[in-house]
Amino acid sequence: MSFSVKGRSLRGNNNGGTGTKCGRWNPTVEQLKILTDLFRAGLRTPTTDQIQKISTELSFYGKIESKNVFYWFQNHKARERQKRRKISIDFDHHHHQPSTRDVFEISEEDCQEEEKVIETLQLFPVNSFEDSNSKVDKMRARGNNQYREYIRETTTTSFSPYSSCGAEMEHPPPLDLRLSFL
């Protein structure tokens, strides 16, 4: 890529045209125009050599370092992405908004809600739970200690993690894996 400068600025090398010394780079109008033109021409991530050439060319219009060029392109890409995201979100939000007619128009079908049925899925079938779901619910209603005792009794075998050669060990009850939509 070739970079050409068509003329010198009347400002010369005076710290970016501000007239004051500052730690922050303040680009001149000419520097911004050239950087913007390069960006619009498709240059998004210049190589190290390209950055060096650009900063040399831009130094005719004011103080500039290679890092300024590098960060300008990084920031400009980020701003462009942000704008695209915002436009996309605004577009999606606009097209997914229900119309006022949809919001205020209620049909008879909407008013007649069906009773929701809660279904328990058996993810980890265990015989002691299969045949005693109602018994478990009753035990839960009576109290947490009785429920724990019931669980310990129904799950303690010589091969159970709740048993240590016949001696009971204190463990929390197994997780309730029923799906609840309340």
From Swiss-Prot:
<dbReference type="GO" id="GO:0009733">
    <property type="term" value="P:response to auxin"/>
</dbReference>
<dbReference type="GO" id="GO:0005634">
    <property type="term" value="C:nucleus"/>
</dbReference>
<keyword id="KW-0805">Transcription regulation</keyword>
<dbReference type="GO" id="GO:1902459">
    <property type="term" value="P:positive regulation of stem cell population maintenance"/>
</dbReference>
<dbReference type="Pfam" id="PF00046">
    <property type="entry name" value="Homeodomain"/>
</dbReference>
<dbReference type="GO" id="GO:0003700">
    <property type="term" value="F:DNA-binding transcription factor activity"/>
</dbReference>
<feature type="region of interest" description="Disordered">
    <location>
        <begin position="1"/>
        <end position="24"/>
    </location>
</feature>
<dbReference type="GO" id="GO:0010078">
    <property type="term" value="P:maintenance of root meristem identity"/>
</dbReference>
<protein>
    <recommendedName>
        <fullName>WUSCHEL-related homeobox 5</fullName>
    </recommendedName>
</protein>
<feature type="DNA-binding region" description="Homeobox; WUS-type">
    <location>
        <begin position="20"/>
        <end position="84"/>
    </location>
</feature>
<keyword id="KW-0238">DNA-binding</keyword>
<keyword id="KW-0217">Developmental protein</keyword>
<comment type="function">
    <text>Transcription factor, which may be involved in the specification and maintenance of the stem cells (QC cells) in the root apical meristem (RAM).</text>
</comment>
<keyword id="KW-0539">Nucleus</keyword>
<dbReference type="InterPro" id="IPR044555">
    <property type="entry name" value="WUSCHEL-like"/>
</dbReference>
<comment type="similarity">
    <text>Belongs to the WUS homeobox family.</text>
</comment>
<keyword id="KW-0804">Transcription</keyword>
<dbReference type="InterPro" id="IPR001356">
    <property type="entry name" value="HD"/>
</dbReference>
<keyword id="KW-0371">Homeobox</keyword>
<dbReference type="InterPro" id="IPR009057">
    <property type="entry name" value="Homeodomain-like_sf"/>
</dbReference>
<dbReference type="GO" id="GO:0043565">
    <property type="term" value="F:sequence-specific DNA binding"/>
</dbReference>
